[in-house]
Amino acid sequence: MRLIVHNMLSCNIKGVVNKFPLRIEAEKVTVKEVDFNPDFLRYMFAKIDWKALVDGARSMEYTELPDNAPDTTTLESDETFLRKFHHALLELHLEEGSLVCPETGRKFSVSKGIPNMLLHEDEV
């Protein structure tokens, strides 16, 4: 599971208010190379929750992203930053581990890179 996917997932348990971001508990992380596309990264930047991305990357042992989101000038001119953003967003893969609801602590397993977000009957 890539961090771009993680950034769009939330806990859907009935009655839960604090659904996002899911905390990552990584057991196995891999890196899979993806073609670098600066235009795609600039487009996606506005759609990404920066703090969730940084926290997710750090939980996967990647610490190259700044705490605060950069400004648009950086996006246009700093290829080094774009490559770090690209690596975190698209190349880091959570292969095995869990996603944890911030409110309930419910763990959703990730196996072979696929998050299991199915709920139990009492959670629907």
Swiss-Prot record:
SUPFAM superfamilies: Trm112p-like. Pfam families: Trm112p (PF03966). Transmembrane segments: none annotated. GO terms for molecular function: protein heterodimerization activity. It comes from the Eukaryota. Residues 2-120 form the TRM112 domain. Acts as an activator of both rRNA/tRNA and protein methyltransferases. Required for TRM9 tRNA methyltransferase activity. Interacts with TRM9. Belongs to the TRM112 family. This is Multifunctional methyltransferase subunit TRM112 homolog B. It comes from Arabidopsis thaliana (Mouse-ear cress). The gene is TRM112B.
